[in-house]
Amino acid sequence: MDPNTIIEALRGTMDPALREAAERQLNEAHKSLNFVSTLLQITMSEQLDLPVRQAGVIYLKNMITQYWPDRETAPGDISPYTIPEEDRHCIRENIVEAIIHSPELIRVQLTTCIHHIIKHDYPSRWTAIVDKIGFYLQSDNSACWLGILLCLYQLVKNYEYKKPEERSPLVAAMQHFLPVLKDRFIQLLSDQSDQSVLIQKQIFKIFYALVQYTLPLELINQQNLTEWIEILKTVVNRDVPNETLQVEEDDRPELPWWKCKKWALHILARLFERYGSPGNVSKEYNEFAEVFLKAFAVGVQQVLLKVLYQYKEKQYMAPRVLQQTLNYINQGVSHALTWKNLKPHIQGIIQDVIFPLMCYTDADEELWQEDPYEYIRMKFDVFEDFISPTTAAQTLLFTACSKRKEVLQKTMGFCYQILTEPNADPRKKDGALHMIGSLAEILLKKKIYKDQMEYMLQNHVFPLFSSELGYMRARACWVLHYFCEVKFKSDQNLQTALELTRRCLIDDREMPVKVEAAIALQVLISNQEKAKEYITPFIRPVMQALLHIIRETENDDLTNVIQKMICEYSEEVTPIAVEMTQHLAMTFNQVIQTGPDEEGSDDKAVTAMGILNTIDTLLSVVEDHKEITQQLEGICLQVIGTVLQQHVLEFYEEIFSLAHSLTCQQVSPQMWQLLPLVFEVFQQDGFDYFTDMMPLLHNYVTVDTDTLLSDTKYLEMIYSMCKKVLTGVAGEDAECHAAKLLEVIILQCKGRGIDQCIPLFVEAALERLTREVKTSELRTMCLQVAIAALYYNPHLLLNTLENLRFPNNVEPVTNHFITQWLNDVDCFLGLHDRKMCVLGLCALIDMEQIPQVLNQVSGQILPAFILLFNGLKRAYACHAEHENDSDDDDEAEDDDETEELGSDEDDIDEDGQEYLEILAKQAGEDGDDEDWEEDDAEETALEGYSTIIDDEDNPVDEYQIFKAIFQTIQNRNPVWYQALTHGLNEEQRKQLQDIATLADQRRAAHESKMIEKHGGYKFSAPVVPSSFNFGGPAPGMN
């Protein structure tokens, strides 16, 4: 492999005129022996210019991520390309050195490479990585340290989320490395250069990945933990060099000194929260938690109090450092030991740290003025909450006020003082209201406060709606949102709250205010009984305002708001549904114009999904208005067409849901034209979305069977999709859905002349059973296709089975099918599946010519019926119970005081501890799908796809059919009757008698229901005579 040829090709990829030819040349060469090794040599060559090396390392990374592991292939298949072992050996030998000596831009790509190599090769093929890491870690050449630590980090990252029992190779390696890392760190502490601090930060990142989800107690004992805690405290406590203050404030968090502090605090907060809180940890950490709390928690807290003091004194503090500090302090509130140390400081922390963090800031004002849309995005970004010091401050405030005495009272006194101060700074008022709103949940449960909250709103919040300051109007809406459950004594106050919020939504000139108003208005309507009526006359302008804001802001929270409003005002929305849907469709098209790589595209995707769900909600609201639904259909089809034709995979799920909603009542000619497009999408890139397509396909089959059967191409397309799923690699859930759809078609088309399809359907389902099946659900669902065919036409099924031949299966398919079915009869769950089994068995035993295999298993048949009917009895009872369940369980008003702790009490989360132990136990056990069953009376997941036999108005009653067939057999074929019944014991005979009695009761009840439905009288409960006797011999038998 000539390196120069590859170098020239790599150089060519950077020239637009040569790129296509260069890429073709590389793609032709990439499977050659030594190609990958040569790429690594090029990447490491300092003689080459950096862009060529970068192009080489990116190509190398793509090769390793795609082609490194060996691939398993089925016998007879061609093995896919993987990197030859000779090349892999060369890469393993050299990649560590490449990472150590490469510049940052190359190194970052190489660490991705080594991550993949470790994932597939350690420890089975590459134990030498541990020796290499050990060698360079112990080297006195500090220039090697950062690179080798990046290699070690990738080793640890590969085990970060694994169960404890799977981490033994890592633990064995870290037995050697952890002491070395600690010694290196102590050695580096005196060196405050940026290179030294970068290395320190990397050691912390390794330590964090090691302990984030599992604490390896065999590695970390009290002695070495003492040393690590001292290191961590030292880093948190040390001053950052003064010259860092010359750096722009926005750039400071990226400096190594602040990053190092951030990771130190990450570790401390994680150790305390996950492993160091007695009463809140799983039992294997109980001893560690006691040690941590008594030996370390207070000492660490002291250092962190100093951090908060520095912040109070207006010294710069990186946001993540402050956030993690507050997280640690928050954990300390729950424990008497740390609380005792914290208690004298808590009021100072609330007033001097939490309060300033909760006030509107200069940075907020700058963003509001320069980019109000970005301001909205930031305030509603859940990921921002995970890293925001303001959210951490809010959490600490809530914990302290809910768990410790006097804190709430003093905090409310502080807030009240600010609110009543005549010329208070508006930003301070904003902070005070922010604090009060954050405590709403506690305040509304406390007798002393909950009655005062209405007056607080009246006196301190309502006046802010006329403030000149946008952020104060937004805060007023926000407070109403958080106090939406307040019990208004005055209707006038409730009306004022609604009117002020409505006006903000419709008339305010500032978008962040409109957004807060939209959310506040919706929660008030949902939580205040009289609110809905008040807003009813304004519903059109309210909805128009909401649609406008969604288009302007593309904010996902608002799509949730509008969905809830549509459900609240379904009648009022119906006349404007078409206008709303047009608006939403235009907004959707606007949102999806963002390319996948553009900034904010993830947020936009979530918003787009919300818009599609909103359109779906509108469809459900107008489903009884046929003419409106028809108008909506055209708009929706344009949206559906856009997504499917442009292959925007991330919206397939919502699009198929929309199409399903459009076909629930009828299937229009336009919706039938959609089926070929759905089929085409399935063939191209929609294979993995079959379960999302299923409700739509089910509608095509059941809602408009006439059209389905009017053109063979429709059934061919649906069968082809099911067949592809059953023979492909879609997974067992999708395969269950495919088999279910075949069963639905067979049942729906009984008597409709699809005899030629039955052999194809049955073969597709039973062929799947010749390959490995992991779940009983798939096994029974495939059997059920054949059972449905038996119910459709017993002779046709048996002929089909006789003609079927599967490889490696000597036994006749008929025998195998019936044996398997009877053996698995206890695996059929829910109402439909058991009913189908009963109907199938009835069809089988009622045949004039009994198949030979049935004589061999005749003793199993009635016990199978009994098992199924017992299950059906439970399933019907459960179904009736669900029907009668009233949803309006009155929630007992929680008047309880939230329980506060004494200063010497710990907050022990007993439920949480038990939950952690259950999770730990489950993590250690492999779930066995084969044996696991949910309550067998519950509806199964696939029962939602109803069939013609599940129609309650015209039921096919399995009890009556069974009884009728059994009476027929008793009279027509005494020998067969005797074969079926001779092995029954007394208990089984009694159970069969009960089934017969229940059959008569169900017939009488159904007749009564029909007469009542048609205006007749209602039967009283009938007295049902026993119709035949299972106790005696069959007629004519001696």
From Swiss-Prot:
The modification N-acetylmethionine is found at residue 1. Forms a heterodimer with KPNB1. Interacts with histone H1. Interacts with H2A, H2B, H3 and H4 histones. Interacts with SNUPN and XPO1. Interacts with RPS7 and RPL5. Interacts with RPL23A (via BIB domain). Binds directly to nuclear pore complexes. Interacts with SMAD4 and NUP93; translocates SMAD4 to the nucleus through the NPC upon BMP7 stimulation resulting in activation of SMAD4 signaling. Interacts with phosphorylated SMAD2; the interaction facilitates translocation of SMAD2 to the nucleus. Interacts with SRP19. InterPro entries: ARM-like, ARM-type_fold, Importin-beta_N, XPO2_central. The modification Phosphothreonine is found at residue 898. Keywords: Acetylation, Cytoplasm, Host-virus interaction, Nucleus, Phosphoprotein, Protein transport, Transport. Residues 22-101 form the Importin N-terminal domain. Signal peptide: none annotated. This is Importin-7. GO terms for biological process: innate immune response; negative regulation of cell cycle; negative regulation of osteoblast differentiation; positive regulation of odontoblast differentiation; positive regulation of protein localization to nucleus; protein import into nucleus. Residues 884-910 have a biased composition (Acidic residues). The modification Phosphoserine is found at residues 886, 903, 1020. Functions in nuclear protein import, either by acting as autonomous nuclear transport receptor or as an adapter-like protein in association with the importin-beta subunit KPNB1. Acting autonomously, is thought to serve itself as receptor for nuclear localization signals (NLS) and to promote translocation of import substrates through the nuclear pore complex (NPC) by an energy requiring, Ran-dependent mechanism. (Microbial infection) Mediates the nuclear import of HIV-1 reverse transcription complex (RTC) integrase. Binds and mediates the nuclear import of HIV-1 Rev. GO terms for cellular component: cytosol; membrane; nuclear envelope; nuclear pore; nucleoplasm. Belongs to the importin beta family. Residues 881-910 are annotated as: Disordered. Pfam families: Cse1, IBN_N. It comes from Homo sapiens (Human).
